[in-house]
């Protein structure tokens, strides 16, 4: 894995405020859709703006940026509801197609479903590495998309505002522009599919907008920055049936995982505050664009690119993040096994009980049949005293047979449940075994990557270099460590790899033949133990300086301080190496 170059431009892995390589906070996933990442419609190669390409990332501040307490939509008079209002229950995404007057939604402000409440509780953390989330729903654009992207349905999700804000919305000043929230509902991409996810883990804020009454009783308008005008009606009851819209599917795998670098890129959200005399509590509303398959692929490519770049310069943090995720998955697998063990134990108990009941019923039937045989000689002699006994025995047998049939059906159902429970437990145990192996591999990799943060002694001889030493930094595996620098550093102890990096550039600055290859600020940089700047064409985003790369990854037992294993690369070449180019 990469040794990176310094830490000054790569810090923030454990911070919720520092930017990384021009990316979002922490892991590149903090701060929401508009996190100062520098990725916006202006520098997005696929265009931007609502309904015209992809516009993930970018903007300023958290959430949607902007917005103010008086930014409720429209003139407060029309309330055009020519489109059928999409019913929106708390926590359930609904499709709404823009009409001439914007999006029409009818929010059912009843109780939040237990499933959504449990997920929000699970996301209270604490979490490392910035923003984490749970993908609740998947989006199937082929069932939603329209020919005109401006008329494509939006996915609208709502939550009770007071459930996600740090302070009651009713207590906010009327001119309050934003409010801090604990969770947001955003879109993200994974495995080339767009998802609607709940995210949490870093400080976030969203605009507060005021809903304005219209001429239609009970209908309000509100404008979320960057989204179509909302025409909202609210009722305080929960729909009897909470079903997903066509094209939106429930994700059965609800693992808590790091949110993506482009999470929230096609989502605009806000807290909507209603007039006091309306009797309605404030609601949080999230509006996400439905991406076409091509747009999803483009965004997934961008997500993968940014993930690779981050991993290349943060190998220890990446390994720790993967270990934390593997451990969380193992914990969930253990819980799954425990649930299935409980189910299987109950199934066995019921199975044994039903079997005992069936055995008893069969014995009763057998006794009745034996009694029939005992009086069978009187069957054809109605005048005989035993004939009545024969009839009674037959009636007993008939009733016993009915009971056996019922007990057999109950036993069969119990046997099926036991079989299903056995299979479910076996599958859960197999999944746990896979998660155990994954957790072990992640722990091993973390232990190896963490070696760069531990003391070590420099080894290796390096290689002879000429007066154009760093010309090779942008080629193949990079430029070698000069042999005369290796002679200076060999057998010396270093606190960590950052310490080695600093001493390496200091020694380069002391070498007359090598130092004369640097001019101006770069000469000053290496004298201070800082990496020199690469040429503009070899820089990528916030990565501007030459970097040290381990030819054999540390995760594969490559020597951390083995100077035969260390190369000097440009940022651009370093990224390409880790992409396998």
Curated annotation (Swiss-Prot):
Annotated coiled-coil segments of the chain: none
InterPro entries documented for this protein: Cloacin_colicin, Colicin/pyocin_DNase_dom_sf, Colicin_R_dom, His-Me_finger_sf, HNH_nuc, Pyosin/cloacin_T_dom, Pyosin/cloacin_T_dom_sf
Record GO biological process: defense response to bacterium; killing of cells of another organism
Pfam families: Cloacin, Col-Pyo_DNase, E2R135
Record-listed E.C. numbers: 3.1.-.-
Region of interest (Disordered), residue spans: 1-74, 242-269, 293-320, 421-488, 513-566
Gene Ontology cellular component terms for the protein in this record: extrachromosomal circular DNA
UniProt-recorded Gene Ontology molecular function terms: endonuclease activity; metal ion binding
Feature: compositional bias, Polar residues: 242-251, 518-527
UniProt keyword Signal, yes or no: no
Disulfide-bonded cysteines: none
Function: This plasmid-coded bactericidal protein is an endonuclease active on both single- and double-stranded DNA but with undefined specificity. Colicins are polypeptide toxins produced by and active against E.coli and closely related bacteria.
Protein name: Colicin-E2
Biological source species: Escherichia coli
Gene designation per UniProt: col
